[in-house]
Amino acid sequence: MSNMMKALVKSKAEVGLWMEDVPVPEVGPNDVLIRVKKSAICGTDVHIWNWDQWAQKTIPVPMVVGHEFSGEIAEIGSAVTRYHVGERVSGEGHIVCGKCRNCRAGRGHLCRNTLGVGVNRPGSFGEFVCIPESNVVPIPDDISDEIAAIFDPFGNAVHTALSFDLVGEDVLVTGAGPIGIMGALVAKRSGARKVVITDINPHRLDLARKLGIDHVVDASKENLADVMKAIGMTEGFDVGLEMSGAAPAFRDMIDKMNNGGKIAILGIAPAGFEIDWNKVIFKMLNLKGIYGREMFETWYKMIAFVQGGLDLSPIITHRIKIDDFRDGFEAMRSGNSGKVVMDWM
């Protein structure tokens, strides 16, 4: 195996990513080197491409980025015992310290020292990625490489949707991006009574309909209260999944929640936006922030959803060769795409 590889690198502090030859990552005793077959583009990668304020404060330059992937094990460290070369895998992109109180209590997803693959350390937009053995997730034979490549965002959706009991509940999802749509699908499959999803992007609304979401609302044209009445809702929503990061959507969600309602918040909102805290208080709402996936319970659950028949393939709207990565990022930046999966093989 060559000691060099192709990779997408944030090599300059400006807009874009660049395909370069870089060294293959070194494998430590507890590490696993994975040959990447499929990579998916995340919204985080778009922020890095755009070199916005968050990216400028967060991303070291130069660095290989990317964190949504699937592949097969190419090499294992001397102390690795659970995996073997050739095994099909994906990986948890949040690397935790294992030493803080939350980690020691089995709550690794709450680690205050979390490092993100492709954000704080070299990522998976390369022919190889190296992660700790503890972050490797085997992929069953009946799950394809491209579906495994979107398990990271699907895990965000599963973690958010399953934060609260859904059986018999009326659920509002704000934001019909890929994660919002997947969250709505999980809610529907988990026994929710009514599932309503809102957005203002026509392409994303059409994609939600294509995936089988029953009640799809264009918030720029339709009044949510009228939709609730039309579908037989006489009280507010029991559970809210905020996936948009849009202040107007979050405010509308709070307004439409039933007393005692529960809201899981994944969307990253602009700093300093206002909500009516009196509604939160007097409706006795429960707000829960979500970041990433529960390690590793969410992975077991999402594998079970897919093996149980949940078809995520329509959420992948663009399949491209890695040399055409600019086309993939153009599609993502336009807002007129679902997931974009890039083929390294």
Swiss-Prot record:
Catalytic activity: L-threonine + NAD(+) = (2S)-2-amino-3-oxobutanoate + NADH + H(+)
Subcellular location: Cytoplasm
Recorded GO MF terms: L-threonine 3-dehydrogenase activity; zinc ion binding
Record keywords: Cytoplasm, Metal-binding, NAD, Oxidoreductase, Zinc
Protein residues bound to NAD(+): I179, D199, R204, L266, G267, I268, I290, Y291
Binding site for Zn(2+) 1: C42, H67, E68
Cofactor (UniProt): Zn(2+)
Gene Ontology annotations for the cellular component aspect, listed alphabetically: cytoplasm
Sequence positions that bind Zn(2+) 2: C97, C100, C103, C111
EC number: 1.1.1.103
Pathway(s) it belongs to: Amino-acid degradation; L-threonine degradation via oxydo-reductase pathway; glycine from L-threonine: step 1/2
The record's free-text note on cofactor binding: Binds 2 Zn(2+) ions per subunit.
Keyword Kinase part of the UniProt annotation: no
Keyword Zinc belongs to the record: yes
A biological-process GO annotation: L-threonine catabolic process to glycine
Site-annotated residues for Important for catalytic activity for the proton relay mechanism but does not participate directly in the coordination of zinc atom: D152
Residues of the active site: T44 (charge relay system), H47 (charge relay system)
HAMAP family for the chain: Thr_dehydrog
Subunit structure: Homotetramer.
Similarity field: Belongs to the zinc-containing alcohol dehydrogenase family.
Purpose of the protein: Catalyzes the NAD(+)-dependent oxidation of L-threonine to 2-amino-3-ketobutyrate.
Protein name: L-threonine 3-dehydrogenase
Organism: Rhizobium etli (strain CIAT 652)
Organismal lineage: Bacteria, Pseudomonadati, Pseudomonadota, Alphaproteobacteria, Hyphomicrobiales
Gene that this sequence comes from: tdh
